[in-house]
């Protein structure tokens, strides 16, 4: 049995790790998967830099965007205006639906609409995303569309947001 590391947190798995949230052995840094990684947020083995997938890397890799190689590192992506905006997509949004705007199915599912005059509809992820997109200024929409390799169809598949609406 390996020695107990008092700096380890419960979410670590593996042996001889320093840092937090590591899976694997002989890791220094945080949020690593694999073995013998130094740095943060690596998947793979023996990496000396951060945000790598693969093995034996000493510099940060460029990331794939829209299924194609880009000239952007993950660190650059994290610091980008586009990521900041995408992280603002609301979740768990509700909308008041008046009785006169309800379908027969909604009325059957929400009989209290007769007393309250409607019901609160919980919007799904794509509806929330589309509302977010509609609220963006043209300048902010262009920030999203300027993501390297931007592809509207792939963006829709991943976010549920149609950029042409």
What is each stretch, according to the model?
Residues 1-165:
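Short, glycine-biased loop/turn motifs at secondary-structure junctions and
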């Amino acid at each position: 049995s390996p020695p107990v590391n008092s700096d380890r947190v419960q979410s670590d798995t593996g042996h001889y790790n320093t840092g937090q949230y590591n899976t694997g052995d002989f890791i220094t840094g945080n949020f690593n998967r694999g073995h013998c990684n130094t740095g943060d947020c690596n998947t793979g083995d023996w990496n000396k830099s951060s945000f790598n997938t693969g093995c034996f890397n000493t510099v940060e890799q460029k990331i794939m965007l829209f299924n194609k190689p880009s000239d952007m590192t993950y660190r650059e992506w994290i610091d980008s205006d586009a990521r900041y905006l995408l992280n603002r997509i609301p979740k768990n949004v509700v909308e008041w639906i008046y009785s006169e705007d309800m379908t027969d199915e909604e009325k059957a599912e929400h009989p209290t609409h007769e007393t309250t005059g409607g019901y609160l509809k919980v919007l799904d992820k794509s509806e929330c995303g589309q509302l977010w997109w509609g609220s963006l200024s043209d300048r902010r929409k262009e920030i999203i569309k300027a993501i390297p390799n931007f592809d509207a169809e792939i963006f829709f598949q991943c976010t549920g947001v149609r950029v042409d609406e």
